[in-house]
A protein has these predicted regions:
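Glycine/proline-rich active-site loop of Rossmann-fold NAD(P)-dependent oxidoreductases
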Residues: 148, 162, 173-183, 217-228
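Active-site Tyr-X1-5-Lys
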Residues: 138-165
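NAD(P)H-binding glycine-rich loop region in Rossmannoid oxidoreductase-like domains
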Residues: 35-41, 45-93, 101
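Alpha-helical substrate-binding/gating segment
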Residues: 186-195, 201-235
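N-terminal Rossmann NAD(P)H-binding glycine-rich loop of SDR-like oxidoreductase domains
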Residues: 3-23
């Protein structure tokens, strides 16, 4: 299989690229610049420079691929209003452009990486893929809003016949995680975590390598139009 991967230089995207290469797949990955793609180059990925702004360009870059994996996105919380347009372009418009490009390029199957954040705050209720966020949605961050909108777009396209499978990872952790959550995990492991801001918070953690395997399974065995939650068996508490 020849796979097209967006966000291959990111935390989840790199793990996915590694997993695909380990099982013998050819990987063409979209990067903003080759100067920061050494890890992808080392594992034998084909690098193409670009971004998510042009559907036509993306379709051209996908030509000849058998599958597409849309992993790219911006993950930040507590951002100033000035950063919101860029996040919207990456997370919402970028998803629209990738899915349109995959259709135009005739990709047999595209896996869109969403998040369990699309469910919103379930107030302790354990839900599955059939759950729908109450309307009107109450967003806890602009990131939350953009990922929910992107998820709805992917669902709508799948319902209209697009060859899309959606995955929804939980809180992902693992090596090279430079997010705020990654920092908290490292502090907790080192015994240096001094404050618990949300002592009643429950997080369903999942290792990045398991997410990469789950994404591959969604492509190989998942039903078109279906969503698959990717989480661990346990639900550890922040307390």
């Amino acid at each position: 299989m020849r796979a097209f991967v967006t966000g291959g230089g990111g935390f989840i995207g790199l793990a996915l690229a590694r997993r695909l290469r380990e099982r013998g797949d050819a990987v063409r990955t979209l990067v903003r610049t080759r100067t920061r793609a050494d890890a992808l180059d080392e594992i034998g990925c084909e690098l193409v420079e670009g971004d998510l702004s042009s559907t036509q360009k993306l379709a051209e870059q996908m030509a000849g691929c058998d599958a597409a994996f849309h992993v790219a996105g911006v993950y930040r919380v507590g951002i100033p209003p000035s950063v919101r347009p860029a996040m919207y372009e990456a997370n919402v418009t970028g998803t629209t452009n990738v899915l349109d490009a995959a259709t135009a390029a005739g990709i047999p199957r595209t896996v869109a990486v969403s998040t369990i954040n699309a469910f919103g705050n379930t107030a302790g209720r354990v839900v599955d893929e059939t759950y729908r966020r109450p309307e009107p949605p109450e967003y806890v961050s602009f990131y939350d809003e953009t990922k929910h909108l992107a998820h709805l777009d992917a669902e709508a396209r799948a319902a209209a016949g697009a060859r899309v499978v959606i995955v929804q990872p939980g809180q992902v952790y693992g090596p090279a995680d430079h997010s705020a959550i990654g920092g908290l995990v490292r502090q907790a492991a080192a015994g240096t975590l001094r404050a618990l801001t949300f002592p009643d918070l429950g997080l369903n953690m999942v290792h990045v390598d398991d997410v990469a395997s789950g994404i591959c399974l969604a492509h190989d065995r998942g039903g078109l139009g279906e969503s698959y939650v990717l989480v661990a068996r346990s639900r550890p508490s922040a307390s």
